[in-house]
């Protein structure tokens, strides 16, 4: 894990060379993150004091969905974003207003980063595997999110059309989880 923290630290140090706010030789930076395991290297670096040891004063700003992190990075609300490759991120990077400087996580075969969940009622009615998502109401954070993209990959893999799924964008992970628990959707990608 320390290696990932070093990667995050290296990115911050590269950014420091470009003219960042300094106070008493401490570099200040705001990092936009989600409350997900994919941001764990940043959480560990913060909790273990790795940033502080390197002369960095890091403030974490939490977001409810990935796409707003890319927007906040380009607007200057945060200095860095730890986020998924969303449609919005690709758009901003394609316009040259956002740069990808490193990657922190990747899926390993058999260990997906995204969970596929069925509501209790949908499960009891037969929603047992991703191939059963066709015809169901499926919560994602946002249209164009990494969860939306993953749903498209599931459709390709299991032989149904994405248009066969009623996509329900709920703007945050907590809203998607609440909809799943409240049975207002059949499934959610979280």
Give the positions of each predicted feature.
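Carboxylate- and glycine-rich phosphate/diphosphate-binding segment that chelates Mg2+/Mn2+
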Residues: 182-184
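Rossmann-fold dinucleotide-binding core
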Residues: 176-178
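Bacterial N-terminal signal peptides that target proteins for export
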Residues: 1-8
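Hydrophobic core
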Residues: 12-17
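Sec/Tat signal peptide C-region and signal peptidase I cleavage site
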Residues: 18-23
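Short, glycine-/small- and polar/acidic-enriched structural segments
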Residues: 24-160, 167-170, 186-190
């Amino acid at each position: 894990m320390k290696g990932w923290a070093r990667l995050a630290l290296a990115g911050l140090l590269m950014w420091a060379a470009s003219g960042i706010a300094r106070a008493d030789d401490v570099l200040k930076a705001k990092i936009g993150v989600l409350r997900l395991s994919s941001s764990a290297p940043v959480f560990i670096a913060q909790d273990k004091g790795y940033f502080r040891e390197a002369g960095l004063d890091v403030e974490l700003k939490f977001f409810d969905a990935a796409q707003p992190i890319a927007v906040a990075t380009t607007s200057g609300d945060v200095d860095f974003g730890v986020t998924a490759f969303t449609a919005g991120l690709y758009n901003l990077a394609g316009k040259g207003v956002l740069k990808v400087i490193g990657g922190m996580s990747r899926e390993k075969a058999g260990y997906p980063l995204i969970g596929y969940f069925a509501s209790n009622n949908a499960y009891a009615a037969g929603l047992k595997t991703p191939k059963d998502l066709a015809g169901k109401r499926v919560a994602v954070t946002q249209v164009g999110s990494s969860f939306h993209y993953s749903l498209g990959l599931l459709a390709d893999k299991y032989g149904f059309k994405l248009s066969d799924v009623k996509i329900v964008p709920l703007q945050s992970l907590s809203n998607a989880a609440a909809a799943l628990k409240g049975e207002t959707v059949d499934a959610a990608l979280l």
